[in-house]
């Protein structure tokens, strides 16, 4: 347990930040899974594109806000783009 007031404050801050990070990362994972699920189900192309756009926006926002490193976000976006492009060409993953 923390022995100093400043250490106690850091514990409180880290708990809040950890909870906030978990919420954002869970939402990001949900959006990515949605895109992958739609591709697996061979859904409408427009539906996949909309889900893809939402996922990309979330990844960009997380990188800007610091919840995710920009290179990590870029890597995830690249992988998603490859999947969506393959799907749109007709070679469903």
UniProtKB/Swiss-Prot annotation:
InterPro entries listed in its UniProt record: Ribosomal_bS20, Ribosomal_bS20_sf
Q: Where is the composition biased (Basic residues)?
A: 12-23
From which domain of life does this come? Bacteria
- Spell out the GO cellular component terms annotated for this protein, sorted alphabetically and separated by semicolons: cytosol; small ribosomal subunit
Pfam families recorded: Ribosomal_S20p
- Kindly state which keywords UniProt assigns to this record, in alphabetical order: Ribonucleoprotein, Ribosomal protein, RNA-binding, rRNA-binding
Could you state a single Gene Ontology molecular function term? structural constituent of ribosome
Query: Where is this chain compositionally biased, Basic and acidic residues type?
Result: 1-11
A Gene Ontology biological process in which this protein takes part is: translation
Q: Does the keyword Membrane apply?
A: no
Q: Where is this region: Disordered?
A: 1-23
UniProt record similarity statement: Belongs to the bacterial ribosomal protein bS20 family.
Function text: Binds directly to 16S ribosomal RNA.
Q: What is this protein called?
A: Small ribosomal subunit protein bS20
